[in-house]
Amino acid sequence: MAAPVRQTRSLLGWVTTLGPGSRGYRAPPPPRRSREPWWPDPDDPLTPRWQLGPRYAAKQFARHGAASGVDPGSLWPSREQLLELEAEEREWYPSLAVMQESLRVQQLAEEQKRQAREQLIEECMAKMPQMIENWRRQQQARREKAQADKERRARLQAEAQERLGYHVDPRSARFQELLQDLEKQHRKRLKEEKQRKKKEARAAAMAAAAAQDPADSETPDS
C-alpha cells in the first residue's frame, strides 16, 4: 500500500517542478478570411484554373454580395446548361407521374408475361395425353424394330451356318464375311421391293387419274 502512495507523490512532485509557466502544444488559430473580395492574378501560372472561372466568382458573390463586384445575372446558367440540368433532373429525379407510369408499365409487362406462361402451361398440359401416346408408340415401334432386327440376324446366322456347316465358329472371320454378304443381299432385296411398290403405286395413281377424266383424251366433235 505504501509503494503506490510513494509513486503518486513522486509524480506530483515532478509535475510541480515543471512550474506554472510550462504548457503543452497549442495549435495555431485558423487563418482568418479576408473581409474584402480577393481576386487571383490570371497571369500567374500558379493560380488554380477553377479560381478563374464562374465558380470562384459565384463563391465571392455568395461571401461578399454586391461588394464583390460580380454581376448577379452572369451567375445564372445559360440555356444549354439549363437544358442539360433539366435532362439530368428528368433522368435521376423523375416526377411522380413518370414514376407511376413506369411502375404501371412494369406491372403490365409482368402480368402479360405471367399470362403467357400460364397459357403455355395450359397448352402443354392439353397436348400431354397425345404426347404420351406418341411416346408410347415410338417406344413400341423401337421395340418391334429391335425384335425384327434380332430375328433377321438370327435367320441370317442360321443361313450362314447351313452354308458353312454347323461346326464353323460364328466368331470366325469367314463366318462374319458371309454374314455381311447375306445382310447386303437382304438390304438389296428390301430396296428393290420398295422401288417395285413405289412404281406400282405410281402406275395405279396414273391409271386412276386417267379413268376419272376420260374426256381429256377424246377429241371434241367439230
From Swiss-Prot:
Composition skew (Basic and acidic residues), residue ranges: 141-170
Residue ranges of coiled coil: 144-213
Placement of sequence motif Nuclear localization signal: 184-200
Pfam families in UniProt: CR6_interact
Compositional bias annotation for Low complexity: 203-212
Localization in the cell: Mitochondrion; Nucleus
GO CC term (a single one): ribosome
Major site of localization recorded for this protein: mitochondrion
InterPro entries reported in the protein's UniProt record: Ribosomal_mL64 (IPR018472), Ribosomal_mL64_sf (IPR043035)
Keywords (A to Z) from UniProt: Cell cycle, Coiled coil, Mitochondrion, Nucleus, Ribonucleoprotein, Ribosomal protein
Keyword presence, Magnesium: no
Keyword ATP-binding among UniProt keywords: no
Region (Disordered): 1-51, 136-170, 182-222
PANTHER family in alphabetical order: GROWTH ARREST AND DNA DAMAGE-INDUCIBLE PROTEINS-INTERACTING PROTEIN 1 GADD45GIP1, LARGE RIBOSOMAL SUBUNIT PROTEIN ML64
Entry's family note: Belongs to the mitochondrion-specific ribosomal protein mL64 family.
Oligomeric and partner information: Component of the mitochondrial ribosome large subunit (39S) which comprises a 16S rRNA and about 50 distinct proteins. Interacts with GADD45A, GADD45B and GADD45G. Interacts with NR4A1 via the NR4A1 AB domain. Interacts with ATAD3A and ATAD3B.
Function: Acts as a negative regulator of G1 to S cell cycle phase progression by inhibiting cyclin-dependent kinases. Inhibitory effects are additive with GADD45 proteins but also occur in the absence of GADD45 proteins. Acts as a repressor of the orphan nuclear receptor NR4A1 by inhibiting AB domain-mediated transcriptional activity. May be involved in the hormone-mediated regulation of NR4A1 transcriptional activity. May play a role in mitochondrial protein synthesis.
Name of the featured protein: Large ribosomal subunit protein mL64
Organism of derivation: Bos taurus
